[in-house]
Amino acid sequence: MRVLGIETSCDETGVAVYDDEQGLLSHTLYSQVKLHADYGGVVPELASRDHVRKIVPLVKQALADANCTLDDIDGVAYTKGPGLVGALLVGACMGRALAYSWGKPAVGVHHMEGHLLAPMLEDDVPEFPFLALLVSGGHSMLVGVEGIGQYEVLGESVDDAAGEAFDKTAKLMGLDYPGGPRLSKLAAKGETGHYRFPRPMTDRPGLDFSFSGLKTFAANTIAKEPDDEQTRANIARAFEEAVVDTLSIKCRRALKQTGYKRLVVAGGVSANTRLRTTLAETMQAQGGQVYYPRGEFCTDNGAMIAYAGLQRLKAGHIEDLGVKGEPRWPLDTLPAV
């Protein structure tokens, strides 16, 4: 089976073609980073309009790169949610229109299921069951995964997601958008031990996260310290260490609770070098293994949507002609495959 996947949940337009025998045949991506940089964050209306401009050329490019015609495509998958409703509707309209005009089945994919399954695009594929840590700009959650669609949300953020905390703290430090990667780059120049940030909600039972307090702590620290490059780097280092330690502590707690020996880490924050190193050490100490998608599949992309959609289309999960976007969509409400 061969599926065209479309991703438009936020500020990346991604289109890919995935074949269940040959693997990933093409992967095209357009980022709106330059468009939103002047505003310090994503402007939903501008994001939607830019998706409209870019999506048709990217579909054509993905088909050409895969050496495919419409006759070679067996189904269409598009991100149905969660995300920015206007952006979602652009991808949903395109996906539904292509499916209808080509006479192919279509399915709306959960954005976070796409991230969760992104490591399946690699050569070293995790076996079920496993624990998934999903960390992005909009979500931070720990999920017990018994199979595709068999998800138990063990813990999630009660306020800011980890990626959101990175971006907001970066903005407080005067760093350009996108702030998270720039903060991590600055943190690499910092020295440890100068500041001690809290590790939120690690002093109590449970697996939920809270990162808004870290942002406030960072704001207060920035306000009272000298505004020189090394001080800013030291603050960035302390902030990053606090986020990574918090995620690591919760992962260890969840692994002990579930007994799983495999950990999948996905979403935009999974590209963070310190997080990868820390969790690799954690799993090695526990005799387990950690799995990540490659860097280009940590952020939003069409390849993960094509893969996830293919699994659901093969299981007969076909949607009607209605065009729907789900800005809020609990992961654990998905049907099993």
UniProtKB/Swiss-Prot annotation:
Binds 1 Fe(2+) ion per subunit. Keywords: Acyltransferase, Cytoplasm, Iron, Metal-binding, Transferase, tRNA processing. Its cofactor is Fe(2+). Fe cation binds at residues 111, 115, 300. It catalyses: L-threonylcarbamoyladenylate + adenosine(37) in tRNA = N(6)-L-threonylcarbamoyladenosine(37) in tRNA + AMP + H(+). One of its GO terms (molecular function) is N(6)-L-threonylcarbamoyladenine synthase activity. GO terms for biological process: tRNA threonylcarbamoyladenosine modification. Its EC number is 2.3.1.234. It is found in: Cytoplasm. Substrate binds at residues 134-138, 167, 180, 272. InterPro entries: ATPase_NBD, Gcp-like_dom, KAE1/TsaD, Peptidase_M22_CS, TsaD. Its main location: cytoplasm. CDD domains: ASKHA_NBD_TsaD_bac. One of its GO terms (cellular component) is cytoplasm. Required for the formation of a threonylcarbamoyl group on adenosine at position 37 (t(6)A37) in tRNAs that read codons beginning with adenine. Is involved in the transfer of the threonylcarbamoyl moiety of threonylcarbamoyl-AMP (TC-AMP) to the N6 group of A37, together with TsaE and TsaB. TsaD likely plays a direct catalytic role in this reaction. HAMAP family: TsaD. Belongs to the KAE1 / TsaD family. This is tRNA N6-adenosine threonylcarbamoyltransferase. It comes from Shewanella sediminis (strain HAW-EB3).
